[in-house]
Amino acid sequence: AGFDMDLGGKDIISVQYQNANNSVRVSDEFMRAYENNEKFGLVARASGEVIETVEARELFRKMAEAAWACADPGIQYDDTINDWHTNPETGRINASNPCSEYMSLDNSSCNLASLNLLKFLESNGSFDAKNFVKSVELIITAMDISICFADFPTDPIGETTRNYRQLGIGYANLGALLMASGLAYDSDGGRQLAGAITSLMTGTSYRRSAELAGIVGPYAGFARNAQAHTRVMKKHANASASAKSVTSLDQDVWQVANKEWEKCLEIGDKNGWRNAQASVLAPTGTIGLMMDCDTTGIEPDLALVKFKKLVGGGSMQIVNQTIPQALKKLGYSDETNEAIVEYIAENGNIIDAPGLKPEHYDIFDCAMGIRSISAMGHVKMMAACQPFLSGAISKTVNLPSDATVAEIEEVYYEGWKLGLKALAVYRDNCKVGQPLSDSKGAPTDAVAEAAH
């Protein structure tokens, strides 16, 4: 209709709240009412009185309908969040940051840092757990020191952060790591490797935190929360110890992770911990690009070939740079590798690529496109990693444009059943200002070629 709705366009600002994240917090009581098709009392936040009684399924359906239409609201599971809370004696967790990965005390903050997982993939195809542990140790130490020199927007935020010293180490490029390892994102092998790496990261972080506590003391709020903090550490450790490996690749990482959790509990029992929280999985949308990552956070690749809208008009074609590495891992020759990459760049997908075996198709499945990962594939990946995080996971469960409201409702329900703390959904093309897509839609001004 003549409106300029591109990113940075003069008319896009008329569509308010397009760049805001809105979530609804639900309790176990509400979810059980949904399961049993019962009524639920909506409670006033200040007084605690029931102000309206509604049909739980009707309200849940309205949430799904809204998310179908515009990708909001996301959902947060209150009881799960607070069951993994290390500081309940200080206060409950009432809210999160906008992306829903940092969940802690009111008036607190958390510095974030992320590791590029693909950098730890060795030439023989194994994951370099030894150097990963060293990197986590270094970053956790540096992040804790940074709190001493940080400025905060308000005095209460500064006071709470210095007293509880929450940290948020995480990672990016998981999707690329799995692809380069010849593992499908939506596979038991992919999920178990992701879970093992996440467990290793958080176990190492808390072990280092306990060591720091022995030198400079535990966080100020530890004494009153010692029992709860220790309980949560044991929950993490037990989840790691009970994990079942699928491949030799994840088995090796689980072994190192479990040793880290054992040391974490042993040292923490003596010293306490320096930090109330240690890990989250953030979106890494900006820093992931700066680290030359193909995939952000815990996400799979959006598409093998994608188009990023540019502020001011036009778009940039981005071809996944991990494809050649994955094909080499799978045993394809250089000549076949080059032909497949060229086919993908021209066609945007791998179907009928010359020389590519159909049994390898799922390794290249992405969030969007002809061969897209199912919604539950996203949710199961989150569930594989959530038990090994202090905070939550900022992740989008991508659905095709023809997805139904019922499918979104199922995603929200299964997220609760699988023990997630939060999740968000995005149905393709449900927003007018969509920065990434798997189709051009605008003249290409620049091309990022795949590395050969």
List the predicted regions and their residue ranges:
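Catalytic-loop motifs flanking and including active-site residues across diverse enzymes
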Residues: 108-111, 167-173, 201, 319, ...
